[in-house]
Amino acid sequence: MADQESDKNIEIWKIKKLIKGLETARGNGTSMISLIMPPRDQVARVTKMLADEYGTASNIKSRVNRQSVLSAITSAQQRLKLYNKVPPNGLVLYTGTIVTDDGKEKKVTIDFEPFKPINASLYLCDNKFHTEPLNELLESDDKFGFIVMDGNGTLFGTLSGNTREVLHKFTVDLPKKHGRGGQSALRFARLRMEKRHNYVRKTAELATQFYINPATSQPNVSGLILAGSADFKTELSQSELFDPRLQAKILNVVDVSYGGENGFNQAIELSAEILSNVKFIQEKKLIGKYFEEISQDTGKYVFGVEDTLKALEMGAVETLIVWENLDINRYELKNNTTGEIVIKHLGKDQENNQSNFHDAETNAELEVQEKMPLLEWFANEYKRFGCTLEFVTNKSQEGSQFCRGFGGIGGLLRYQLDMRTFDELSDGEVYEDSD
């Protein structure tokens, strides 16, 4: 579950990055094609439509614009030939001629299958790429569990996006409190407590059945909301019969006036704010845990590019935490004199310093073999180091402190590691790491 969650967050980050790049691209005339095909669409339909468009575009008066549009349609047709059918999650294709920052024209073609089904159909020729439909991929589809429990029965449900589902409900007949009974009053009270206890136990057992995935033994929901009109919900949340794995997932305990489906709807309304901030809460928890390791000086943490990469190479990092807008590039540089390959990680200021592109001892020039954002490199390579990758924002107080105070990169370690012992191995170059 955690791995799936982490993978999904990385896919979302990649889409965000792609949208950012596509939104800023501009072209001359209407030579930029945005094409989105939902699942179960037909490639043949789109191919025919593009052929018709090609015929229409041949009549464009302006020669330059006509050539650009025809070229973009041809690119789209060529790319579609690679697909026999639309992939299960749909297909997104952007192609056209864009104008670069230095005024040159450049052909771009991007096609991919989204990480989850896209429910949009789009074909537009314009002077920009249309990315609005991609925003639905960024919407959270986290699933939340709801347990609505009162004196008449319990309802188990889930909410994902705007879709609510009732998994199961059952009713109970609990004896009411009463003052009669004479000598039997204590016995009645005991029977009543026993029935209440059995009711809580049954609810706890069913909760485990519905909200724990038997294959992974992990919760299949991102959070749990307990709701009800009496104190049953509180009793359940504090009961030792309630699975501790689910106890850790409780986001909120709310009072509702009804039981059953009406109570379910009311619980959703009352929890709306908490559910919308769940990513925010997870981020605060993660960075809070990181700060706790630092304040207790456990040695199970690492920060800064250089130390984090050393710990990664050793396989010591369990969770790699990176600010989603970290502006550092990874350079693969070749020393032309010795043929040696050097890896450097440089921020914007360091890129302007030419000494970073020369050998410190011989002053030989280092030729750039490859340059890519460090974030992208992490997204592609993190699994190789056996860690999970978590992107964080600087919107929460903790996130902002992490970005300002720790350079926006760090990790929680599997075991204690004193990074100072590796300092003498370093050559003192900031953001540098050699293969």
Swiss-Prot record:
According to its record, what are the GO cellular component terms? cytosol
Name of protein: Eukaryotic peptide chain release factor subunit 1-3
Keyword Acetylation listed? yes
Primary residence: cytoplasm
GO MF terms held by the record? translation release factor activity
Q: Describe the subunit structure.
A: Heterodimer of two subunits, one of which binds GTP.
**Physiological role:** Directs the termination of nascent peptide synthesis (translation) in response to the termination codons UAA, UAG and UGA. Modulates plant growth and development.
- Quote the Gene3D superfamilies the UniProt record gives: 3.30.1330.30, eRF1 domain 1 (3.30.960.10), eRF1 domain 2 (3.30.420.60)
What domain of life does the native source organism fall in? Eukaryota
Q: Keyword Hydrolase, does the record have it? A: no
Q: Which residues carry this modification: N-acetylalanine?
A: 2
GO biological-process terms attached to the record:
translational termination
Q: Which UniProt keywords apply?
A: Acetylation, Cytoplasm, Growth regulation, Protein biosynthesis
Family per similarity comment:
Belongs to the eukaryotic release factor 1 family.
Query: Where is the protein situated, by its record's location annotation?
Result: Cytoplasm
